[in-house]
Amino acid sequence: MPRKISVVAAVIERAGSYLICQRPLEKRHGGLWEFPGGKLRDGESLEDAASRELAEELGIKVQTVGKPLLSLQDPGSNFVITFCSVEAVGEPTAKEHLDARWVEAGELLDFALAPSDQRFAHTLMND
């Protein structure tokens, strides 16, 4: 059985809106929207991975990473995605994504979200 690959997804909320990013076309789930983040390196914590990925991909600085909100097995892959509440400063710039947007909670499901992100958005809406 393939080794599980841990992924952190940053749930960044500002003034009632959440940051979502559109995945590059050449990647898995290309063109779909996601909560930003990425794979953990060997021995890396969720906090360190979130800080590194958000700086690399969006040019924003993480202040705090909260405890995990939800962990999901990504359908059809060996990725396990852990969604964490993150506070970050700076205005995001899509460096690796096609686009980055602030979206109100009630509008999240209007976007074509990647499967695990869609499942998380449903959870978020029901809380």
Which ranges hold each PLM region?
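Conserved hydrophobic "DFG−1" position in protein kinase catalytic cores
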Residues: 12-13, 20, 86, 102
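Charged phosphate-binding loop/patch that engages nucleotide di/tri-phosphates or the phosphate backbone
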Residues: 116-127
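Active-site-adjacent beta-strand/loop module that shapes the phosphate/pyrophosphate-binding cleft
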Residues: 61-62, 70-94, 101, 105
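HhH-family (HhH-GPD) DNA N-glycosylase catalytic core used in base-excision repair
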Residues: 51, 55, 60-65, 127
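Conserved Nudix-box catalytic region and its N-terminal flanking loop in Nudix hydrolases
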Residues: 14-56
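Conserved N-terminal beta-strand and adjoining loop/helix that marks the start
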Residues: 1-19, 39, 70
